[in-house]
């Protein structure tokens, strides 16, 4: 294994959801100038790159993941000039820019789709059309947002496929003209100085051409990691990603280790790295998201071990707890009360000790929590609103559903970034597009920066350590307590260096008896005021975590 990593192999990436980051116009919606305004803060944190979720022209049915024009910026967010300034200002601080590419589908407002409504247009073949009867779709596949994955178009008397909202029509990747257009989009942004791309649900781009009924499920096995997915990504990589030096991270929906070993192979023939979500389903009993359930920490550790060991020396992992589709991790796996700070630090220390590229989602670095919404009118997310309506229809209790949304909704991570204890948490001078978290007076950036023992400084140190200690980049992964539901203990080794991580996942004190620990250890990180200089028998406090290093 080489000692000279790609920048992303010992770097850390910060995800920005621009809509909720910083508003500079008083519109109540964040914008690109808001990102520029906060670059100094991101530089202080020490991140290597920022990934921006979509800011393209969009009807905003799915918060910008329904793109109507891939090369134009939605006026809500600013202009191309603003974007160019953002690139320049970020690069002057050593921060790279990663853009989100939504290439599985477009908005039905996209010019291609409008043309495609005419059966004679060449753009008809840009989408997936099938025959059927008005009441009988081509097959029984389900949309990920509920209902059938097919929408009838009366004028042309055919159905089009939409794996997500009906306003998000799936592109037909079998058509070389589609792939050529998408390559042009990548070139457009590479020309403007973009360093990387995050590819939305990119393992869904190849569908089984037979479009069979799924007798045992919702259809996903016929389009997830589909027959030509690797071939298509190989072509995109050969023609655009590698020639333009773009880092790529694929968001992989319901994928497998075996596929990701190919997508993110260290040979670099498809993508640089992959996101998978298996570890964020350990509180989905029986695979069911819309329930209230405690996380299964043994399952969580088993999944991390599977991916850490399976990808080691084969392919590259992306590491994350949070994004714009997930609830806040400290609320989910930690504590919102008296132990919020140690819990947030512990979760950071467990993740950032692993192999891969860590991603931090805005607000995670100050320990932001779920907002505790209590009314359905507080929500904006299409998935949450659809599920509430669908499950109410099935006779489920409204209060129960609201409790589930308060813990599982995607809106939990979409509330405005908490900058200060001032009006609207310093996010906007106007009316915010979605309500604020109810604790922004206590939990905000200003307070975090003023407190040397805040969660922020733990993240800052973890980011710096990643560049200093090669064992973090290249080391293997050994789970030393795989069956403990309360302690997470792992070891990483590389060329005579050893990192030992111990964490208490519970709010109770826990005894820990390490095996024989020879040699000299150095205390590197801890989340309470003091910790043992050496790994030895000890009682771990609630959510306590410690890193020791041996060279």
PLM-predicted stretches and their roles:
Residues 1-551:
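Active-site and adjacent substrate-binding regions of carbohydrate-active enzymes
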């Amino acid at each position: 294994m080489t000692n000279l990593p790609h920048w992303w192999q010992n770097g850390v990436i910060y995800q920005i959801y621009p809509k909720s980051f910083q508003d500079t116009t008083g519109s109540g919606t964040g914008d690109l100038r808001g990102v520029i305004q906060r670059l100094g803060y991101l530089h202080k944190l020490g991140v290597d790159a920022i990934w921006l979720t979509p800011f393209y022209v969009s009807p905003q049915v799915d918060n910008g993941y329904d793109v109507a024009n891939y090369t134009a910026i939605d006026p809500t967010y600013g202009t191309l000039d603003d974007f160019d300034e953002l690139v320049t200002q970020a690069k002057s601080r050593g921060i790279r820019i990663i853009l989100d590419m939504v290439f599985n589908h477009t908005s039905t407002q996209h010019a291609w789709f409008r043309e495609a409504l005419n059966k004679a247009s060449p753009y008809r073949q840009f989408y997936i059309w099938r025959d059927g009867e008005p009441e009988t779709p081509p097959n029984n596949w389900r949309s990920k947002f509920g209902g059938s994955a097919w929408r009838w178009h009366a004028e042309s008397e055919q159905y089009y496929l939409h794996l997500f909202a009906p306003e998000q029509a799936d592109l037909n990747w079998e058509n070389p003209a589609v792939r050529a257009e998408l390559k042009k989009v990548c070139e457009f942004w590479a020309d403007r100085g973009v360093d990387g791309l995050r590819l939305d649900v990119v393992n869904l781009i190849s569908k089984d051409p037979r479009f069979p009924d799924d007798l045992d499920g919702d259809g996903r096995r016929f389009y997830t990691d589909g027959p030509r997915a690797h071939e298509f990504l190989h072509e995109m990589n050969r023609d655009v990603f590698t020639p333009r030096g773009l880092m790529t991270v694929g968001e992989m929906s319901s994928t497998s280790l075996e596929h990701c070993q190919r997508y993110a192979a260290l040979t670099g023939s498809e993508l640089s790295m992959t996101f998978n979500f298996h570890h964020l389903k350990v509180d989905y009993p029986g695979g069911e998201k819309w329930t209230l359930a405690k996380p299964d920490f043994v399952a969580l550790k088993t999944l991390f071990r599977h991916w850490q060991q399976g990808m080691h020396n084969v392919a590259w992992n992306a590491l994350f707890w949070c994004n714009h589709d997930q609830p806040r991790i400290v609320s989910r796996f930690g504590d919102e009360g008296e132990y919020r700070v140690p819990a947030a630090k512990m979760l950071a220390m467990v993740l950032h000790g692993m192999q891969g590229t860590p991603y931090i989602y805005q607000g995670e670095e100050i320990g932001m929590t779920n907002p505790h919404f209590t009314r359905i009118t507080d929500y904006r997310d299409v998935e949450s609103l659809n599920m509430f309506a669908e499950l109410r229809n099935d006779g489920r209790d409204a209060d129960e559903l609201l409790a589930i949304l308060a813990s599982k909704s995607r809106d939990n991570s979409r509330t405005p970034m908490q900058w200060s204890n001032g009006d609207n948490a310093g996010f906007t001078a106007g009316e915010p597009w979605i309500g604020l978290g109810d604790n922004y007076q206590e939990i905000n950036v200003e307070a975090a920066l003023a407190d040397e023992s805040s969660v922020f400084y733990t993240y800052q140190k973890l980011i710096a350590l990643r560049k200093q200690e090669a064992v973090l980049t290249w080391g293997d992964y050994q789970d030393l307590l795989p069956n403990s539901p309360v302690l997470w203990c792992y070891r990483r080794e590389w060329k005579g260096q050893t990192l030992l991580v111990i964490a208490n996942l519970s709010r109770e004190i826990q005894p820990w008896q390490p095996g024989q620990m020879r040699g000299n250890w150095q205390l590197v990180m801890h989340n309470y005021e003091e910790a043992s200089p050496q790994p030895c028998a000890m009682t771990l406090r609630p959510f306590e975590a410690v890193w020791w290093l041996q060279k």
